[in-house]
Amino acid sequence: MKDFKDKVMFITGAAHGFGQVIAEGAADRGMKLTIVDIDEPALKKTYQHILDKGAEVLMVTADVTKEASVDDAVEQAMEKFGRIDLLINNAGIALPGRIWELPTRDWEWIMHINLMSQVYAMKRVIPIMIQQKTHADILNVASIAGLVDTPGMPSYHASKFASVGMTEATAYDLQRANIDIDMHVMCPGFVQTDLYHTENHRPAQYSDPTDPYYQSEAYLKGQQFAKYVITNGKPIDTIADTVFKALEDNRFYILTHPEYNPLIEDRVKRIVTDGAPDVHIMDGIM
């Protein structure tokens, strides 16, 4: 996508972090927006920031873990704007916890928001983009955790590896069908967001505060670690420019932390040389 002015973007997870700065960056570039999030008070702030920039914007409060909610948000966007040129699936959470400790409901939550919300939006929006008969783009926000593995977060890795793989496979399908939609996957490292506030947005269907896991040392240490690495991550103020430059250049993989590239290379090397995961590769990093 070379020209953003007057194009229509649909973005999830727009109340905080990447979603907020990307949405505001889109407004700066003259785009029209549908912004979606479960956190209505915070979403209203993003909405006002975009209005202040003079952009046309629709705000939809929705739980994107539910397919019907995603369908309704897309329908509202189409009613207002009549098209979607850029879909950004950004909604996501992080839940630390080893596989034998993390409650099943947490696995269900993270897979539904980090993966299935992307599936729901793509299933609904790709047919719309095809019918438009004009160029369109889809960007799925995954993580460096979708390219390399680390200890302590198997649910997060599972969801992000799945997002990367799904995006790659969809790119093949679109190319084979000669459909003019370009796919992109963003795999950021640690960035200064409020991702460690995941618990503030937990839907009731995934909540059980009486579960002893949430008072366990493992859980509390995981929360502390998540807060530390995120608050000490890369400043977020360059993310919007990174995203839109990548879209202009039609880059498929959008990486924000080149210092992690050796970890990606090491993982591929281990795969092709019959190597095995070695926790010591994380020494000095995690």
Curated annotation (Swiss-Prot):
Catalytic activity: (10S)-hydroxy-(12Z)-octadecenoate + NAD(+) = 10-oxo-(12Z)-octadecenoate + NADH + H(+); 10-oxo-(11E)-octadecenoate + NADH + H(+) = 10-hydroxy-(11E)-octadecenoate + NAD(+); 10-oxooctadecanoate + NADH + H(+) = 10-hydroxyoctadecanoate + NAD(+)
Gene Ontology terms, MF aspect: oxidoreductase activity, acting on the CH-OH group of donors, NAD or NADP as acceptor
One record GO biological process: response to toxic substance
GO cellular component, one term: cytoplasm
Signal sequence, renumbered to the chain: none
Record-given protein name: CLA biosynthesis dehydrogenase/reductase
Annotated compartments: Cytoplasm
Positions that bind NAD(+): D37, D63, V64, N90, Y156, K160
Gene assigned in the entry: cla-dh
Family, per entry: Belongs to the short-chain dehydrogenases/reductases (SDR) family.
Active site: Y156 (proton acceptor)
Domain of life of the native organism: Bacteria
Function: Is involved in a saturation metabolic pathway of polyunsaturated fatty acids, that detoxifies unsaturated fatty acids and generates hydroxy fatty acids, oxo fatty acids, conjugated fatty acids such as conjugated linoleic acids (CLAs), and partially saturated trans-fatty acids as intermediates. CLA-DH catalyzes the dehydrogenation/reduction steps in the production of 10-oxo-(12Z)-octadecenoate, 10-hydroxy-(11E)-octadecenoate and 10-hydroxyoctadecanoate during linoleate metabolism.
EC number: 1.1.1.-
UniProt keyword annotations, A-Z: Cytoplasm, Detoxification, NAD, Oxidoreductase
Pfam family, one: adh_short
Metabolic or biological pathway, per its Swiss-Prot or TrEMBL entry: Lipid metabolism; fatty acid metabolism
